[in-house]
Amino acid sequence: MVTKEDVLNALKTVADPHMGISIVDMGLIRDVEVDDEGNVKFKLIPTNPYCMSVMAMAFQAKEAVKSLEGVKKVEVTVEGHVMEKDINEMLKEKE
């Protein structure tokens, strides 16, 4: 079974392209949830509401978690960005 720690470790492999620091270490990941069926949810909150890299980071984060054995579905929600509605729609389309 996948744990919250497994998810955070996978997310540590994703770095902010401008800072070169993992999105976990930067504090951009919140509310990680893992259920017994392997469904994972978490929020990505960029440091600035106009961050141009948030889409790339969100897709990389989703793929990093999807690659974990036992993960069935990954739901990433971007919050605090001026285009969060559009970004979240695109993230859902790529399932």
From Swiss-Prot:
<protein>
    <recommendedName>
        <fullName>Uncharacterized protein MJ1129</fullName>
    </recommendedName>
</protein>
<dbReference type="InterPro" id="IPR034904">
    <property type="entry name" value="FSCA_dom_sf"/>
</dbReference>
<dbReference type="InterPro" id="IPR002744">
    <property type="entry name" value="MIP18-like"/>
</dbReference>
<dbReference type="Pfam" id="PF01883">
    <property type="entry name" value="FeS_assembly_P"/>
</dbReference>
<dbReference type="InterPro" id="IPR052339">
    <property type="entry name" value="Fe-S_Maturation_MIP18"/>
</dbReference>
